[in-house]
């Protein structure tokens, strides 16, 4: 049997024996996960340790694999949206909008400018939520619990905005082909204005708690670094790539949903270490706030919140209950009886943790012929073993946290 097919414990046994014979080192094998609280999800890493230092690492994935891509091949297009919610659930509206935009690209549907701006606001709120979670949890892993408690109240305020828009909080299933299911209420805009007023001072204090904190700096500077060349070789995108010094953002390189209408800076780091990843996400929160304000200022007048495409757009529920025509359209669309061309496309959006891509191939039937999700977490986790070699066990936890690997997206 090839050594590569042996379990890590067996392969490591040979290394342990050789090292013990050479210099008397007492090496050990440690299972980190799959149900360890420090890993923030169902991850397993089998580590070869020399004391507290990691010599080798091998990840095991698939503990919560749900075969999303195969399930999608047997579902009508509208019924796939809930699957996207359950990948990176920290920023699920971005996943929803990415999927709708993929279908709109396939069908050649032009979304009204106002609906595009509303989507931008939702996606930037989701990005803020994602970065709040990632950076505050990184603080917890370095021993600073205060920041986590301080900013998590604002995640709740964003969830209240989601609730006002679509009725859901975490797995939002937000939007429709062509726009939104309903126009935003005045209460949604009021809550958004209140968030934009209250959150910036709190985020500034959060930054001050960490960016000049000597203990935090000691735990994160020059820890888990990766070069720009290595990051690109692995296929890094998002904050993890930009922290390594590469200026690439899907919103700028391939604008969608009218992102070209907004002025914002793409924050870029230098060393690609844990501290740079933290700082890039902090800076991106400020840019997201700026984009939201610009979208509100430039919002077109009127109440256009969806494209006029009755063959694809689900009618409002009140119409379904009171109109036979709306009921028929609702049934046809949900059950997949909609005209779809034979085609294949790829569409990507800038997710909370990197480029989230959708490759969709259709054969004209009511379900996709093939659907592939480009999941940034899957790529980061491949680099994780190399990034923690030679690091201390306590540093490995921090490095994983700074990469923002979400188990639901990793395994899909």
UniProtKB/Swiss-Prot annotation:
SUPFAM superfamilies: HydB/Nqo4-like. The keyword Flavoprotein does not apply. It is a peripheral membrane protein. Disulfide bonds: none annotated. It catalyses: a quinone + NADH + 5 H(+)(in) = a quinol + NAD(+) + 4 H(+)(out). Its EC number is 7.1.1.-. It is an enzyme of class 7 (translocase). One of its GO terms (cellular component) is plasma membrane. It is found in: Cell inner membrane. NDH-1 is composed of 14 different subunits. Subunits NuoB, C, D, E, F, and G constitute the peripheral sector of the complex. NDH-1 shuttles electrons from NADH, via FMN and iron-sulfur (Fe-S) centers, to quinones in the respiratory chain. The immediate electron acceptor for the enzyme in this species is believed to be a menaquinone. Couples the redox reaction to proton translocation (for every two electrons transferred, four hydrogen ions are translocated across the cytoplasmic membrane), and thus conserves the redox energy in a proton gradient. This is NADH-quinone oxidoreductase subunit D.
